Structures are given as C-alpha cells and as structure tokens.
Regions:
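Positively charged, low-complexity terminal tracts
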Residues: 1-84
Length: 84
C-alpha cells in the first residue's frame, strides 16, 4: 500500500483534531484518528527521514510538532523506565 505522506497534515497541538487533506487511504486516516499521539509521531518520523518526500514549510512545521509530541508522550516515558 502506498501512502502519500504529503497528503497528511498532523495536529498542530495535542488538543486539536488531526487535519487530513487530499485523498489518503481511509485506514491510515483511522489510525491517525484513533491513535493520535503514537501514529502522528511515527508518521512524522517516517516523513521527516524520507528525503524523497516534498513538503512545504507549513507541513514541515506540523511534522516538527508531531515529532516533538511523539518524543514527549511516547519516547520520554519509555526512556524513564530505564533511568536509575
């Protein structure tokens, strides 16, 4: 299944709803909707690391914020488990 990452915009904050533009597969939209923090972070990381995907400055801002959310709400609590 191909995903058009450029057609996805991430939530600008934890309190806002995800914004999906253009046509993407419904199941991807469902994942983002149901598992907002984790899915947004994972998709953002994939997109952020993929030099083939072209995004505009607004989308880059959404990506940076989603990566930050992923780190704050998912990665940080996991890392805390390994701290002395």
């Amino acid at each position: 299944m191909k995903i058009n990452f450029a057609a996805i915009k991430f939530r600008p904050s934890l309190s806002s709803e995800p914004v999906v533009i253009e046509d993407i597969h419904k199941q991807i939209a469902d994942v983002i909707w149901q598992r907002k923090e984790v899915a947004a972070g994972k998709f953002a990381l994939k997109l952020y690391d993929n030099p083939e995907v072209e995004v505009d400055e607004t989308e880059k801002g959404y990506i940076r914020e989603a990566v930050g959310e992923f780190r704050q709400w998912v990665a940080a609590p996991i890392l805390e488990l390994f701290e002395d």
